[in-house]
Structures are given as structure tokens and as C-alpha cells.
UniProtKB/Swiss-Prot annotation:
Region annotation Disordered: where it falls in the sequence: 127-148, 378-406
Binding site for GTP: 166-173, 191-195, 213-216, 283-286, 315-317
Gene3D superfamilies documented for this protein: GTP1/OBG domain, P-loop containing nucleotide triphosphate hydrolases
Residue positions binding Mg(2+): 173, 193
Keyword Nucleotide-binding set for record: yes
Main location class: cytoplasm
Occurrences of domain OBG-type G (ranges): 160-334
Compositional bias per record (Acidic residues), positions renumbered to this chain: 385-399
Record's protein name: GTPase Obg
């Protein structure tokens, strides 16, 4: 199934039913009085988190959803039936945004959680409601109120405990295959991974955590180059990041340079995301046969990054060191959960960090969307509205060229 993590939809709640003007008419009963009933309320629209879904592809082509209208009132004081509510299932981890105001309406992070996104219209009143001591035969009614209509943007962020960072071919997919039952595609060319992959890692008999593998980052990713920028947002809700570095690249490039690229692009995308707990994982060390060279490369990466956090040396292909790493991750997650329960200040600091990451990620992606809209309309920037040839060659010297992948 195709992975879709952003869609725009239009929702329209049902209108309320109209009130009825009616009078009682029976044999031998003169001037029976009003008996027009009220209309029914319009149906509302809800989004519900469904644990069985992992993509928004169902909303890629069907984008308009209307709830049922309330029925009109009937005679004999009969109230019209209420319109049926419409419940739209979405994956757990979906953020709902008002497309016009960019206001966050809600976040569906728990299975079964339900969020109203469009309120059904209020019912109209029948003429019975307007009877009084001075007006015994009212001819006044009210129509039903229109249902709420909204343009929504749905954003899916996968819910994972651990996120994998690295250049293409750093071994992220091989790592997730080594520690879980997930089987993402693995090949010896860049961008083998095109969409996020999730794997459940079992530690012992009763404990487990979820790992998210996103497409590799490249130089200029924060400005839109490559694939990774679209999926960096999925790391916003992870609890720990694993920075994988290919220590034996086929092109014989410097692993320290590759590590710097990831740190730099991560900071450009979201400075707050760099404050997330991050561990350095040096992969493919089994391909370096000389122990002295192995230690030298390891030390070069650590010194170049000024790294002071945990460092792990592994071979994802041979599964060497992966079990110890998984156990340490599980231990960290357990300790983190316990500290969140016991230390309110720590919990508050993490909540603030999470919010900053969400805000920065959304602002960066919105800026890229705006830039793409300008380019599609034939504008290279806001000050060059008269450029009709849509040629961006003069920009090539100022930074990376931006490629958009559908």
C-alpha cells in the first residue's frame, strides 16, 4: 500500500432540519392549534484514530466528505430525525490542522481517540414553539442552521520510540532488519528507502520498542534536496535518535564529513530536534580489517563532532553489537518513563521541547511548501514575479537545487 503522510480534505457537517408550520385538524375540534415539530440536528463529522491504519492514502483521491442532513419536522409535534454522524478513520499519530488559519485542531495519538472537526447544524423550530397566551395560532418557524464546513490538512507522524538518522546507504534499513522482523528493501544504491519503515524490537520476553527508518538525508536536505526532508517530521515524536555513520563508504569519502552533514542538516531543519537524546552508531566497522585504522576512524568522527554522548560500534549486516545496543535502548526508555512519572520538572521540560520541535518542523515544511507554490506559479522568489522563463540556473551557485518528489 502506498505511504501517504499528508492530505488536504474538505468536510461539511449536515445542516439542521427545518421546523414545520402545521395545525391540528380533526373532526369536531375547532382551531386545534399549532402542532408543527422541530427539525433534526445535522450530523457531525469526527476523525477517529485507528490502530490498523498506517497511511492516509484513503484520502488521497476522495477529498470531500459530507455528513447527513437532519430531517425536517413533522406534523403532530413530530421531531425530525437527527442526521447520522460521519466518522473518518485515520492512523494513530495524525495531526489535524485548519488549512485556512493553520490552527492545530487536535492531535490523535491514542487508539480510539475521537476528534470532532465539523459540528452539525442546529435544528429549526416548529410553530408549536411560538405558541403563547396572546398568539394561539403562530405561523412562525425557523430554518435549520447550516452545518460547519472546514478545509483540513491531515499530517501523519509515525509513532516510534527510536528514529534512525544517516546518509543514504549508511545501513539504516540493514539495522532495522537486524533488530526486528521488518524487512525493508536493502540495496547498494542511494535512496533504496523511499518511505518510512517501522520495526518492533523485542527485548526479552515482555519488552519491546518501535524503530522508525526514514529515507537518508543529503547535503541541502533542510532546503528541500533529496527525500529525507519530507520525512524528518516523523522523528519529532521519537524519544531517542540513532545517528548511523557508514565507516567504510564505497566512495572512500571521509565518514567524519558524512557525520557532519547529518548534524548540520538536522540543526537547519529544527534546532530543537538537535537537543533530543541522540546516540552515535558507527556501522560497517567489520569491513575495516586493520584495528589501528578502525580506532583512528572512530576517533576522527568523535573529535570532528565534539561528541560527548554514547558511542556504539556495530555491524548491522553481521548483527555484531546490535543486541547490546537494543538492550541499552530499552533500558534508557524504561528509565526515561520512570523519571517522567517521578520528576514533574523533567516532564515539563520534555513537553516544552516536544512542542518546540513540532512548531519548528511545521514552520520549515510550510516554508518549503510556499517556495514550491511560488516555483509552480513561475516565480523564483517573491521579488521576481516577472520571470517568465522559469530558469533557476543563476541560483545554482547560492545553494543546493531543490528537487520535489511527488
Amino acid at each position: 500500500m502506498k505511504f501517504v503522510d499528508e492530505v488536504s480534505i474538505h468536510v461539511k457537517a449536515g445542516d439542521g432540519g427545518n421546523g414545520l408550520m402545521s395545525f391540528r385538524r380533526e373532526k369536531f375540534i375547532e382551531k386545534g392549534g399549532p402542532n408543527g415539530g422541530d427539525g433534526g440536528d445535522g450530523g457531525s463529522i469526527y476523525l477517529e484514530a485507528d490502530v490498523n491504519l498506517n497511511t492516509l492514502v484513503d484520502y488521497r483521491y476522495t477529498r470531500r466528505f459530507d455528513a447527513q442532513r437532519g430531517e425536517n419536522g413533522g406534523s403532530k409535534d413530530c421531531t425530525g430525525a437527527k442526521g447520522d454522524d460521519l466518522v473518518l478513520p485515520v492512523p494513530v499519530g495524525t495531526t489535524v490542522i485548519d488549512a485556512n488559519t493553520q490552527e492545530i485542531i487536535g492531535d490523535l495519538t491514542e487508539p480510539g481517540q475521537r476528534l470532532m472537526v465539523a459540528q452539525g447544524g442546529w435544528h429549526g423550530l416548529g410553530n408549536t414553539r411560538f405558541k403563547s397566551s396572546t398568539n394561539r395560532a403562530p405561523r412562525q418557524t425557523t430554518p435549520g442552521k447550516p452545518g460547519e464546513a472546514r478545509d483540513l490538512k491531515l499530517e501523519l507522524k509515525v509513532l516510534a520510540d527510536v528514529g534512525l538518522l544517516g546518509l543514504p546507504n549508511a545501513g539504516k534499513s540493514t539495522f532495522i532488519r537486524a533488530v526486528s522482523a521488518a524487512k525493508p528493501k536493502v540495496a547498494d544504491y542511494p535512496f533504496t528507502t523511499l518511505v518510512p519503515n517501522l520495526g518492533v524490537v523485542s527485548v526479552g520476553r515482555y519488552k519491546s520498542f518501535v524503530v522508525a527508518d526514514i529515507p537518508g538525508l543529503i547535503e541541502g536536505a533542510a532546503e528541500g534536496a533529496g527525500l529525507g526532508i519530507r520525512f524528518l517530521k516523523h522523528l519529532a515524536r521519537t524519544r531517542i535518535l540513532l545517528h548511523l555513520v557508514d565507516m567504510a563508504p564505497l566512495d572512500e569519502s571521509d565518514p567524519a564529513d558524512a557525520a557532519e552533514v547529518i548534524v548540520r542538516e538536522l540543526g537547519r531543519f529544527s534546532p530543537a530536534l538537535t537537543e533530543r537524546e541522540r546516540w552515535l552508531v558507527l556501522n560497517k566497522m567489520d569491513q575495516i580489517l586493520d584495528p589501528a585504522e578502525r580506532d583512528a576512524r572512530k576517533q576522527a568522527v568523535i573529535e570532528r563532532l565534539g561528541w560527548e554522548g554514547p558511542v556504539y560500534v556495530i555491524s548491522a549486516l553481521e548483527r555484531d553489537g546490535t543486541e547490546a545496543l537494543s538492550q541499552d535502548i530499552m533500558r534508557y526508555l524504561d528509565e526515561r518513563t520512570l523519571r517522567l512519572e517521578e520528576d514533574p520538572q523533567y516532564a515539563e521540560e520534555l513537553a516544552e521541547l516536544d512542542q518546540r520541535i513540532e512548531d519548528e518542523a511545521r514552520a520549515r515544511l510550510q516554508a518549503l511548501d510556499d517556495a514550491r507554490a511560488l516555483r509552480r506559479s513561475g516565480l523564483k522568489n517573491a521579488g521576481a514575479a516577472d520571470d517568465d522563463d522559469f530558469d533557476d540556473e543563476e541560483d545554482d551557485g547560492d545553494g543546493p537545487e531543490i528537487f520535489y518528489v511527488p
